[in-house]
Amino acid sequence: MKKTFSFTVLILFVIPLLVTGLMDSMPQRHPVEGWCKRPLPNQKPGPCNNDRCSARCKEQKQFEFKGGKAMGICSSENRCLCTFRCR
């Protein structure tokens, strides 16, 4: 009984240390790493519309990436910014 108890305590103590050590050694990536944001090149003056901005970003060939298309969002300065995969 005593050996089983000490073995269990040892396992419960060693496994979390191993897992923590393995997790620390893995490279951590920032969630937005590899994504770029550029202004829409041919934006007309006037207020920015999110739906139109997103549609125009998806139409731009320069913002296409493998497996998807760009997303557009209006900035606080009424500029359309296209977010796309740049790596």
Curated annotation (Swiss-Prot):
User: What Gene Ontology terms for biological process does this UniProt record contain?
Assistant: defense response to fungus; killing of cells of another organism
Annotated signal peptide: 1-21
Q: Name one GO cellular component term.
A: extracellular region
Output the Pfam families linked to this UniProt entry. SLR1-BP
InterPro entries xref list: DEFL (IPR010851)
Please classify the protein's predominant subcellular localization into one broad category: secreted
Q: Could you name the domain of life of the organism this protein comes from?
A: Eukaryota
Task: Tell where it localizes.
Answer: Secreted
Swiss-Prot/TrEMBL keywords: Antimicrobial, Disulfide bond, Fungicide, Plant defense, Secreted, Signal
Disulfide pairings: 36-86, 48-74, 53-80, 57-82
By sequence similarity, the record places it as follows: Belongs to the DEFL family.
Kindly provide the name given to this protein in its UniProt entry.
Answer: Putative defensin-like protein 169
Lineage of the organism: Eukaryota, Viridiplantae, Streptophyta, Embryophyta, Tracheophyta
